Amino acid sequence: MTGCPFSLIYSAATTMDQLRASGRVTYQGGLMALRVGEEGDRPWVEAKELRGGRLRRFEADRVFLASGAFGTTRLVMGSQDRFDQDMTMQESVQFTLPFVSMRPTVDPRTEQLFTLNQFNMVVRLDEQGRDLSQLHFYTYNPAFSAALPGGLRWQGARFLTTAVLQRLSFAIGYLPSWVSPRLRLRARPSRPGEVTELRVWREDPRWHRNRTLRRVLSRVARASAPLDLWPVLPELHFAAGGKSYHWGSSFPHSTRASSTSTDTLGRTDRWRRVHLVDASVFPDVPATTFTLTIMANAHRIATGALAEAW
């Protein structure tokens, strides 16, 4: 897939541009954060200029880390010298599954479409709605044509190619992290002025033993006739570990902070004024989209931090 079209969905860059224009924030661009820490009650950030490589140090009353679960985890592990120690991260594993329909649509290559998914399917596996699997459906993308067998890309097979594309859709699905294999992380020291090295690998997935996956595929298959969406099960594939973009829980919230968990304000046991505010602090990762949940939790942490005595 070729990604999301520019400006059709919300981007935090839009809000940031508005804040910069109003003078409410000062944006420091062209920098890469290398380390964070605290000296007394004063947190600091060491960053490197991407042009020239000069190191700079910033101090503040509070530091909020929102580099994405992987970026924040790497930054924290490197800053706390947690090298050659295995850590875990939860992932909502991603799978891809093509579908065919009996009834054709118009030729999708002639439609004014965008590369966002056209519709979603949610498979509920319990009465509470906690165990969910979500599938995002895409009806056409230039990648479809490029992935067709060679015979269907032949100029003389245009009629057959059109017939296939009129009936083909493609789903990207997710399983919740509590039934997905976990990711393993290990940090290695880097040279001075360089970002911490981070090795990532996945536990043995053992898909054939995944009961939740079998239930999801069974539910999807049972809905095939009324929806006219027939899954091509032999073409089920799983993304490599860490490729789902649905990960977190490397420093999950807990009632008491530790070296591997954070308190309800996103602080490990070593820090009082450095707060983790992205998905790295989630207790687990759902199969549904969770960007708004990340934003709401970050807002809650920032509000709580501001309410504390400075």
In which residue ranges do the predicted regions lie?
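Alpha-helix capping and helix-loop boundary segments enriched in small/acidic/polar residues
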Residues: 3-7, 84-87, 286-289
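A glycine-rich dinucleotide-binding beta-alpha-beta segment and adjacent secondary-structure elements
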Residues: 28, 34-37, 212-284, 291
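Helical element adjacent to the flavin cofactor pocket in flavoenzyme catalytic cores
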Residues: 1-61
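C-terminal catalytic lobe of FAD-dependent flavoproteins
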Residues: 149-224, 230
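A conserved FAD-binding loop/helix module that cradles the flavin
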Residues: 284-305
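Internal hydrophobic alpha-helix adjacent to the cofactor/substrate pocket in enzyme cavities
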Residues: 80, 217-222, 298-310
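Mid-to-C-terminal "cap/lid" subdomains and adjacent gly/pro-rich loops that border
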Residues: 47, 54, 61-177
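Active-site-proximal substrate-binding core of FAD-dependent oxidoreductases
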Residues: 86-96, 105, 239-246, 304-310
